[in-house]
Amino acid sequence: MKFFIDTANLEDIKKAYKLGVLAGVTTNPSLVAKEGIKFEDRIAEICQAVPKVESVSAEVTPDAVTAEEMIAQAEELIKINGGDEKVTIKLPMTLAGLEACRYLTEKGVKTNVTLIFTVNQALLAARAGATYVSPFLGRLDDISEDGVLLVAKIAELFDVHQLDTQIIAASVRHPDHVTRVAMAGAHIATIPYKVIEQLAMHPLTDQGIEKFAADWAKAPKL
């Protein structure tokens, strides 16, 4: 399973990229709004900061409700950073979003259909040609449904029908989510930087480092 970072914060993206584990970036209008910068400018900055990733998701804005409006926005977004091929158009899981997805796919544009909460939604998006689908774990957990089980069902369905669409586990809130979606068959987990930090940490690791340091301090030196 690959890792994307879910943020529009440039410093967090740069820190994650330096670790050598990052395969992509996902953003949304809410994340960009927190940064207080023009959307297109931030996407361009992200593309420049992570030259070797496979995807930078740029979502159409909420005021684009028809397929035509989404496509018009997408055609501007794919020009970012000189037509950077990493730019992936993120579309909502609506009928208009599916129509836009099919059109963009036929034009060779990568797409990420987001706000997936059912297997049927994922299947529709895959059949519309989506490069990625993004089921939301945490939001399902919030209403006492099993987000990880949804990922597992989508993965099984895609395998049975030999669909190439990749599953991005989104709304990932803690390390256990990451472990479970990896075992459930997600191709990618998109996670905030704080979860990346949590994945790398364990108290026994810290204790081991401290023990090695203490022992080394006592060792004879030449």
UniProtKB/Swiss-Prot annotation:
Primary localisation category: cytoplasm
Listed GO CC annotations: cytoplasm
Pathway where this protein functions: Carbohydrate degradation; pentose phosphate pathway; D-glyceraldehyde 3-phosphate and beta-D-fructose 6-phosphate from D-ribose 5-phosphate and D-xylulose 5-phosphate (non-oxidative stage): step 2/3
Listed CDD domains: Transaldolase_FSA
Reactions accelerated catalytically: D-sedoheptulose 7-phosphate + D-glyceraldehyde 3-phosphate = D-erythrose 4-phosphate + beta-D-fructose 6-phosphate
Gene3D superfamilies xrefs: Aldolase class I
Transferase recorded as keyword: yes
GO BP: carbohydrate metabolic process; pentose-phosphate shunt
InterPro entries recorded: Aldolase_TIM, TAL/FSA, Transaldolase_3B, Transaldolase_3B/F6P_aldolase, Transaldolase_AS, TSA/FSA_arc/bac
NCBIfam families listed in its UniProt record: fsa_talC_mipB (TIGR00875)
PANTHER family, sorted: TRANSALDOLASE
Name of the protein this chain belongs to: Probable transaldolase 2
Gene transcribed to yield this protein: tal2
